[in-house]
UniProtKB/Swiss-Prot annotation:
<dbReference type="InterPro" id="IPR000629">
    <property type="entry name" value="RNA-helicase_DEAD-box_CS"/>
</dbReference>
<dbReference type="GO" id="GO:0008380">
    <property type="term" value="P:RNA splicing"/>
</dbReference>
<dbReference type="GO" id="GO:0005737">
    <property type="term" value="C:cytoplasm"/>
</dbReference>
<dbReference type="GO" id="GO:0003676">
    <property type="term" value="F:nucleic acid binding"/>
</dbReference>
<comment type="function">
    <text>ATP-dependent RNA helicase involved in mRNA splicing. May destabilize the U1/5'-splice site duplex to permit an effective competition for the 5'-splice site by the U6 snRNA, resulting in the switch between U1 and U6 at the 5'-splice site. May also act to unwind the U4/U6 base-pairing interaction in the U4/U6/U5 snRNP, facilitating the first covalent step of splicing.</text>
</comment>
<dbReference type="Pfam" id="PF00270">
    <property type="entry name" value="DEAD"/>
</dbReference>
<keyword id="KW-0547">Nucleotide-binding</keyword>
<keyword id="KW-0378">Hydrolase</keyword>
<dbReference type="GO" id="GO:0006397">
    <property type="term" value="P:mRNA processing"/>
</dbReference>
<feature type="domain" description="Helicase ATP-binding">
    <location>
        <begin position="169"/>
        <end position="351"/>
    </location>
</feature>
<dbReference type="Pfam" id="PF00271">
    <property type="entry name" value="Helicase_C"/>
</dbReference>
<keyword id="KW-0508">mRNA splicing</keyword>
<keyword id="KW-0067">ATP-binding</keyword>
<feature type="short sequence motif" description="Q motif">
    <location>
        <begin position="136"/>
        <end position="166"/>
    </location>
</feature>
<dbReference type="InterPro" id="IPR011545">
    <property type="entry name" value="DEAD/DEAH_box_helicase_dom"/>
</dbReference>
<comment type="similarity">
    <text>Belongs to the DEAD box helicase family. DDX23/PRP28 subfamily.</text>
</comment>
<dbReference type="InterPro" id="IPR014001">
    <property type="entry name" value="Helicase_ATP-bd"/>
</dbReference>
Amino acid sequence: MLRPVSIDDLISDTVPAKKPRFLIKKRTFPQPEEEEASKALSHTVIKRKDNYRNLDEDELYEEQVSNEPDDLLFLARKSADLLKKRQNEDESIVDNYLGKHWSEKKYEEMSTRDWRILSEDFNISSKGGTVEKPLRNWHELKLIPEDLLNIITNDLHYNEPTSIQRSTIPNVINNRDFIGVASTGSGKTLAFLLPILIKLHGIPPLNSITKHDGPLALVLAPTRELAQQIQHEGQSITKLWKRPCNIVSIVGGHSLEEISANLRDGCDILVATPGRLLDCLDSHLLFLKQVNTLVLDEADKMIDFGFEDQLTTILAKTETISNRQTMMFTATFSPTIEKVANGYLKKPSYVTVGGEESKPKIKQIVRYVPDEEEKLKILVKDFLPNYKAPIIIFINYKRTADWLFDKLREARFRATTLHGSKSQEQREHSLSLLRNGKVDILIATDVAGRGIDIPNVSLVVNLQFPKSFDSFVHRVGRTGRAGKTGTALTFLTEEEDHSAMAKLFDYVKKNDFTGENYISKEAMSKYNVDKSSYKPIII
């Protein structure tokens, strides 16, 4: 006979009332790690529950104190493991919500978002093909051999790579052809020299046989001044390097006999202007049998100067070299440049360095001073003593250069001149004096000054306004380079062309990247400039 149903039985067998559907919490299926943590937690609680049954209050307190830290540590470790996995899968919760910057992370912790922010920080953009991630610093990934790294950082004090260096070096080291669009003064010379030297690091030095087969690397530049500047910068590294490395330049102004003597012992890196290089090739002074790296520096200027045919001829002469790697640097990417790139570069990585960094940080000052002696007085009193060397003063005529040189020497300023009447040897000597700090001021005409690449120019002076507006832009561009701030002082007289003045004032207005550009009241009045658009100069 069945026993009567008790009240307790009824209570225990009652099916719990269901919650309304909208109150039921959606079930989520735990990941294996979560199940493991859950089981461990459950096991811990059950074990402790069993242990507590027959303990008095004092024993229970002691058991709690002895077990709780271990349980919490176990749970903390499990939680940390789960969080780390989720962070890796979802580009890091901490990054997205707490804003941990890429510079605070190790390389392997970098997410896609971090690389995007790094590129934005340094104004680097890319398109087409595969592009390697930019360098975060010189030391990471050990891309640069230790001996070269010590020269770059300790001896030459290049503390951080520039934007173009960050993007060029990883791509070139991975044997990609490369196109870099960057302004002059962005540090691109080191950007292509360093990968060349890294490649040479793993190649035996030239011997009595291979030295006759031509250079291992060829750099083409539009002007002799730029070619010599590249040679000078390369030699500043190689003279400190244990590996023998000969850098030779071939430019106009040097006889074929002199060039032949320089090439007698062979050269690892040859820097040349297109026309003079073809002269040497036609005269069989050298061959291009073993060029494994070809650099076109300032390719847009080479096209502008009419070197397109010469350029394509040289490219064709090295086309048969199967392992040739080509780098092209240009400030603009015109259809002509694109045609050359499509014809001679193989699936290149394409990087543009632009944005705020490429905008020249130049404070422009325009003054109307018709009297030459008054210009000199303002220059000597208000400007030259207040700016660090090097300083460049542009003039239009040789006689003005000689007159100004004498006046500055009387005022105890150290200066040198650069103009068309000087020989190539004299020009090189003047530039050497400036670069080595033996003089502070260079007085130059446009013809002589074209293509000169002098770093860290603090002040450019247009003592006489140039005959073309393009020359003015070129002059002013000698300062405010590679992220540094510079000043350009322009003197006007009553003889200036009004259409050129309209261009000048418009240029000064639109290129006020420092917010400090000024035009004097006298200049505005003389050339009928809208006074509401410009601030008067205060000196």
